[in-house]
């Protein structure tokens, strides 16, 4: 099992891509197959809910609810561990700080530049 915080952009990409063999789709498949165990907190769930419901992504409520309910049921709810360093994008701080709460976990993102450079922060291709 791989424990990981999944950045919102990975979920969005997995759902809107037409490439069923893309790395983001594989991350989501691995999550649903119990290979990747998602780590989350209430802020992360709130962002997932907000972003996935944006009209521009044209996602069905059933698909959004399936993803969010799965994460809440089978994932690990965790608190943030404060990180005093600078973040290129402060809106991403909760994702990074939650990833710090579980030893040997990862943060999977398509936006490496938004996070500190560390082996903990990986792309979808790197985690699959």
Language model: regions and residue ranges:
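Short, well-structured N-terminal submotif of metal-dependent ribonuclease cores
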Residues: 1-38
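Short, active-site-adjacent cap segments at secondary-structure transitions
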Residues: 11-12, 46, 114-116
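Residues that scaffold the ATP/ADP-binding catalytic core of kinase and kinase-like folds
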Residues: 13-15, 51, 118
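PIN-domain endoribonuclease scaffold, especially VapC-family toxins
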Residues: 29-83
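Mid-chain, well-packed structural core segment of small domains
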Residues: 72-104
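Acidic, PIN/NYN-like endoribonuclease modules and their adjacent C-terminal/linker elements
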Residues: 93, 100, 105-108, 112-128
